[in-house]
Design a protein with these regions (language model features):
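Hydrophobic alpha-helical transmembrane segments
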Residues: 46-61
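Hydrophobic anchor at the beta1->P-loop junction of P-loop NTPases
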Residues: 556
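The conserved Walker
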Residues: 548, 560
Length: 755
């Protein structure tokens, strides 16, 4: 069941009014319009008449009115205009991959003086504009320990974390995890910026191939291993859609030096790792090379260029870390998309307009059919500042209500009739204030960015449209960043550095609803891991080594015809192909013989008329792990006698003592000379019991007689079948009801003797 939480309205839309129900910005702009427009009117009127003067005044004042009134995504007109001019005219649009080391050519002698002058002027105008693909990547230096110097005084670090079980839990357990996630979001103070990166990136085909590789063993089954590996590869491509999920948490702060930054970041890192582990989330801090590898994958989405990097090569080659991760080129020549190498991309932001959201919203956003990157930049607002801001908003709303009531009185209609938005904003603001003051909530400023990619423009637009439909179903909007594609994409790199000023104020509980967890992935990277299928929640492969789990046992259940036997046979085959383990099959329906024989195993048919014999008294020195094989064998023989005697009565102490006394006697000859001919059989035990003087010995011997001299003497023979093969199947279909339980017990014991 989905868990819903309410989302407060965006109170940043409520502006503080000063005079005439106008904001400070509007008063300044209207004042400037009047100061410039009115003198222009009188000046032009003298020479061109009132009509021309009026037109002139209107043309002069309209831009100021637009600056005062127009706003998009919380950004005023002059900011939007600045972004347009920079993207269209000042910043370099095409940026090729170009190294700038000691081996690079510093000057092209064929350049003319005019070309040099034009280039110089362009560089002067675009002082901060990157000229190459490397310069476009917005960080200064990456250190070995994972700390990145992003700007002169800003440093960041990154933690990688994995999924955990969530979607299939009960509602109360989900609510507890949501509370823990909300508390985790409050871990960062207002001086720390943090960024969640949820990436669906193309799988590393070589790495996936190595993970699913099955080494050959020259045991006659290598052809099956090749087929099995091919099957695994096909399942991996269809199940994961060729994508791999990478989840990162990056955090950064201002510091005067690297030493100060390292001390602060390591302290935060320890708190973050401890908190995540308490939530049963696997997390690890990644080093500089791993951060570079992740960025390389982001910057090379769609191509198969491998990341090859060595810290020692930096000094030898004169290159920088950016030279190892940069794409072949960047092209930011369009306002609503960009090109990275041969692939296209588009950055959008999530406009959260819904009144409530459920805990599966992020999962649905991330359930992509193509590569995409979702990023949440979060900045905590100081509690006192947040309360002050909300109180000011409530004051503005109350002032607006008073103005509306005055209008109602003048207009002669009911003063209780208020605009819907005004009433809703007022309720939400008071609710938010109460949450901040009484419910231990914090106010967070969130920037939610999503990068879609495609090999062609059409594919890109299809991917964006598909995501937009999902977003609209949640009563939210996916809005493309206009003329901020570069800043948007660079903000999605795991550097905890946000260049987009579009923010949404949310409480910790409403931010926590964007919880990423679904179900813990089970993918053991050991040679003994076996393919079990596809997780129906995560749609990922389940490849597990059961011996590494806390409870390695398994039970296959299902209705008739659902494939229980098929699944069992599949796992048996996988065990033989991928591990060194032995397989022992107890077959009550005689259905596994063809498979066992095909895999080179041994089938043993056990019944009253069979000539395949198993001696229940077989023993060897490996029978017990504690160097007491006879003691363990005695326990087995006593269990066998309890089944032979039948009924609800168990053997008493006297009967146990009789059997325990006889067992060492029948094994003396074998231990003196351990050859198969000296191994005792049930008849030897029967004869030894008859030698005992107690009355109860006679009872034990009489019960055993049926299995020694009677019609059920199938187990009174020495073993004549090969039990050393890796796969042994015991066919007990025709064993009969009288021997069924005894046969099952003996089969269980054989696994100790034959190994």
């Amino acid at each position: 069941m989905k868990i819903y939480t309410s989302v407060p309205r965006d109170l940043t839309r409520v502006k503080e009014k000063l005079l005439f129900n106008l904001t400070k910005r509007q008063i300044v702009c209207f004042g400037l319009a009047a100061v410039i427009g009115l003198p222009s009117y009188f000046f032009v009127k003298k020479s061109a008449g009132p009509t021309a003067a009026t037109l002139c005044m209107v043309f002069i004042m309209i831009p100021m009115f637009l600056v005062a009134m127009y706003e998009k995504n919380g950004q005023p007109l002059e900011v939007l205009f600045k972004q347009f001019v920079q993207a269209k005219y000042l910043r370099t649009k095409e940026r090729p991959y170009k190294t700038n080391n000691r081996f690079a050519v510093k000057k092209n002698p064929s350049d003319s003086g005019k070309e040099n002058f034009i280039r110089h002027m362009k560089n002067k105008l675009s002082k901060d504009s990157p000229q190459t693909a490397q310069q476009s990547i917005p960080y200064r230096k990456m250190y070995r320990d994972g700390i990145c110097k992003v700007t002169d005084n800003y440093y960041s670090k990154t933690i990688q974390f994995k999924d955990r079980n969530y979607q299939l839990l009960k509602d109360k357990e989900k609510e507890m995890i949501l509370d823990d996630w909300g508390s985790f979001l409050k871990l960062f103070g207002n001086s720390v910026e943090f960024e969640f990166s949820f990436m669906s990136l193309p799988e590393d085909k070589d790495l996936t191939k190595n993970k699913l590789h099955i080494p050959i063993r020259f045991d006659g089954l290598d052809k099956l291993r090749e087929e099995h590996a091919k099957m695994l590869k096909e399942h991996a491509e269809t199940a994961n859609k060729g994508l791999e999920d990478v989840w990162l948490l990056s955090f950064g702060l201002e510091a005067k030096s690297l030493k100060e930054a390292k001390m602060k970041l390591e302290h935060i890192e320890k708190e973050v790792l401890d908190s995540l582990r308490k939530m049963q989330v696997d997390a690890v801090s990644i080093c500089g090379a791993e951060r570079l590898k992740v960025m390389h994958r982001m910057l090379h989405i769609g191509d198969e260029k491998r990341f090859i990097f060595d810290w020692g090569s930096l000094h030898r080659s004169g290159l920088t870390t950016k030279d190892y991760i940069a794409p072949t080129s960047f092209k930011f020549d369009e306002g609503r998309s960009f090109q990275m190498g041969a692939n296209f991309g588009a950055v959008s932001y999530l406009s959260i307009t819904a009144s409530e959201l459920n805990d599966e919203v992020l999962k649905e956003f991330l359930d992509a059919e193509s590569s995409q990157i979702a990023t949440m930049h979060i900045q905590t607002v100081d509690k006192a500042t947040a309360i002050k801001m909300v109180k000011r908003t409530i004051t503005e709303i109350d002032r607006s209500k008073i103005e509306e009531q005055k209008k109602a009185v003048k207009g002669g209609y009911d003063m209780d009739i208020m605009p819907t938005d005004l009433s809703t904003y007022g309720k939400d603001a008071r609710k938010l204030l109460n949450a901040l003051q009484s419910e231990d909530e914090s106010l967070l400023l969130v920037t939610f960015l999503i990068v879609n990619t495609g090999r062609t423009k059409n594919e890109l637009e299809e991917n964006v449209s598909r995501l937009r439909r999902i977003v609209q179903q949640k009563d939210c909007e996916l809005c493309r960043l206009d003329y901020q594609q570069e800043q948007g994409f660079m903000s999605c790199l795991p550097l905890a550095h946000n260049q987009i000023e579009i923010q949404r104020a949310l409480t910790t509980s409403s931010t926590a609803i964007f919880i990423p967890f679904t179900a813990q992935e089970i993918f053991h990277e050991s040679g003994a891991a076996i393919y079990y299928g596809v997780d129906q929640v995560t749609k990922k492969l389940i490849i597990a080594d059961r011996k590494r789990l806390k409870a390695p046992n398994a039970l296959i259940v299902g209705s008739s015809g659902s494939g229980k036997s098929f699944k069992t046979k599949e796992e048996m085959t996988s065990v033989l192909l991928m591990t060194n383990d032995d397989v022992i099959v107890c077959d009550p329906e005689a259905e596994y013989r063809p498979l066992v024989e095909k895999l080179g195993g041994q089938v043993i048919r056990i019944c009253a008329t069979s000539h395949d014999y198993i001696n229940p008294l077989d023993i060897n020195m490996n029978y017990s792990e504690e160097d007491e094989p006879l003691a363990l064998k005695a326990e087995f023989i006593m269990s066998l006698f309890e089944l032979i005697l039948g009924g609800s009565e168990k053997m008493d102490a006297e009967e146990r003592s009789i059997i325990d006394r006889c067992i060492p006697e029948i094994y003396k000859k074998y231990f003196a000379e351990p050859i198969p001919e000296n191994m005792p059989v049930l008849e030897d035990l029967y004869n030894q019991i008859l030698k005992q003087k107690e009355e109860k010995a006679k009872r034990l011997a009489t019960a055993l007689e049926l299995y020694v001299k009677g019609s059920l003497k199938v187990f009174n023979h020495r073993t004549n079948v090969d039990l050393k093969k890796r796969m042994v199947c015991f066919d007990i279909k025709d064993l009969g009801n009288q021997l069924k339980k005894i046969g099952m017990l003996i089969v269980q014991d054989v696994r100790f003797v034959s190994r």
